[in-house]
């Protein structure tokens, strides 16, 4: 994919992005300022979504029982039998001792990473994978039925979150007032450019 960004002459705060999308040349103008604000805003919103979800699960049983929350009830009962992956989620339910901490602490760590813009692309990828599992668990039936979800077809909040995380990672939103901006200047990253794929 070819991408070129150039500054327009009459509006210094606007830029033009030219790229190729599905084999066609596309271009659009955007405001640098508003793009930065919107990326930062979306990043903080997604950080809150994950952090709140993880902390609610962690504190479900109170301070004295931090791992009282269990995914088993959801995996055993909430995934419809018509869901083509029903058996997969029943299998996961057998391993609550592994799945529960992964979900709880995964959500908290993803939320913190998004909040502080640290290892952003890695965190966004992990969050998108988690949202993918939540999305597939919401299927009421299979492809032949149109992939119905709770309030419609195909698209639900998990799907939207998954796409938002993909977009934020693609734009490198972790560099906006984030730790990744400084991590990229370290000697370790400069000597190992592949680490940049985890940052940004």
Regions found by a protein language model. Give the residues of each.
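Extended, low-polarity transmembrane helix blocks
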Residues: 1-79, 85-109, 116-200
